[in-house]
Amino acid sequence: MDLKKLDTATQPSASPRALISYSHDSKGHSKQVLDLANQLRADGIDCRIDQYISNPSEGWPLWMDKQVEESDFVLIVFTERYTERSQQGRKSGVRFESVLMLQELYEAGMINDKFIPIVFEQKNSQHIHKWLKPYSYYVLESTAGYESLRRRLMDDPAVEMPALGPPPTKKGPIQP
């Protein structure tokens, strides 16, 4: 049985695919990430996290590379620890993921629709990587923050632009 075909066959084609990149700061933080992933899946977003996989046969680095490449979006949960682990010279999964993401962003000419910074608390916004600071980030302290993120992932703006009306008719020159 081809598990890849089975996996994609069960997913609606309109569902965006998202990966969550995060550091295992604590059990509580990992639970927040799991809850977020579960909620996104419940809302029709094909969300992937490492917690859903016990042992990828290709190994963690190749699994992560594949997830980053195949995802429509990568949600990056910034904390102080995430940023520390991503620093040059560190040997960690977060460092590896950061390099993959930065390289993809570089190759796209820094045009970014894919890599989305998120924080569970506003205070962690100071830890967003400088190469992601020019882009919108989402604070998930409230339902409104989550809803904004969900709408972005589903390409469902909160305010729809109205249709453009006809141009004004020319009235001719002004008569003296």
Where are these regions (language model features)?
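C-terminal interaction surface of TIR/SEFIR-family domains
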Residues: 1-18, 22-42, 87, 111-176
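A generic local structural motif
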Residues: 5-6, 60-63, 103-104
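Conserved BB-loop
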Residues: 35-65, 80-90, 94
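Amphipathic alpha-helical transducer elements in NTP-driven molecular machines
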Residues: 61, 95-99, 143-147
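An anion/phosphate-binding loop that grips the pyrophosphate of nucleotide cofactors and donors
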Residues: 71
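Arginine/glycine-rich "motif VI" loop of SF2 helicases in the C-terminal RecA-like domain
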Residues: 96-113
